[in-house]
A protein has these predicted regions:
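Beta-sheet repeat architectures centered on beta-propellers
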Residues: 1-249
Length: 249
């Protein structure tokens, strides 16, 4: 999971979150981020390029248990695994989840939905038929929040003045779902769930294709400390290479 040129430091906080320090020495760049999960991180260990964690979480049984987990780039959710099934019914989940666990499921470029494990299985046939494999786990919401967007004009800086963010342009790579919110956390979030399709029909459905390129979002409202909050509502692929923000006053 960490076969990368950057340097990392992982610190377990008292509240069960992980503070992650990220550094690229050659470019003189560094920063912090916070990792959260549906449960509490207990301890963490790196073995060469692999990262393991002990997490205290409820698997649906109503009892908090300790699980040894590994971070992997190809898993779209926490406490996630690949499960086989037939006709979009995925059974034998009790090896991972207890009955009554509320989980999310994805298949390829599709978000199948939120399900409650019952009888050791979930049934996604009403969403998409004919599936034999799916990722099932607990989703998390990646969130990127900018500092207050400021600008300097001929009369001086706009700090403290009511400002609007009418437009945000994201430079996306292989992205299937993203949402943009601003100028404050109470503003309406603008979701982009990719609907591009290929000409290939699988199981009666046109397959979606990820978007690479620049996508524009229009926002409403004013704030004295306008920010842009980027997140997503569905556990699908998301990569942001850059952001352009337009400020009006």
């Amino acid at each position: 999971a960490l076969n990368r040129s950057e340097s990392y430091a992982f610190l377990i906080n008292n509240d069960g979150t992980i503070a992650v320090f990220y550094s690229i020495r050659g470019d003189q760049k560094a920063g912090w981020t916070l990792w959260d999960t549906q449960g509490l991180w207990h301890s963490i260990c790196a073995v060469h390029e692999r990262l393991f964690v002990v997490c205290a979480r409820d698997d649906g049984s109503g009892t908090t248990k300790l699980f040894l987990e590994e971070f992997q780039d190809d898993m779209p959710m926490d406490f996630c695994d690949t499960f086989s099934g037939s006709a979009s019914v995925f059974g034998s989940l009790t090896s991972h989840f207890s009955n009554n666990a509320v989980v999310k499921a994805t298949n390829g470029n599709d978000f199948l939905g939120t399900f409650t494990v019952s009888g050791g299985e979930i049934d996604a046939s009403a969403v998409k038929s004919g599936l034999s494999q799916a990722f099932i786990g607990y989703s998390f919401s990646p969130t990127l929040k900018t500092l207050p967007i400021d600008a300097t004009i001929q009369g001086g800086p706009l700090t403290g003045e009511p400002r609007q963010i009418p437009k945000v342009v994201l430079d996306l790579h292989s992205t299937l779902a993203v949402s943009v919110q601003g100028p404050s956390t109470t503003s309406t979030s603008r979701d982009l769930v990719i609907r591009n399709t290929t000409d290939t029909v699988t199981g009666g459905f046109m397959e979606r294709s990820a978007v690479t390129g620049k996508e524009e979002f229009r926002l409403l409202g004013y704030s004295r400390d306008p920010r842009v909050i980027v997140s997503q509502s569905f556990p699908l692929d998301l990569q942001i290479n850059g952001m352009i923000v337009e400020v009006a006053f």
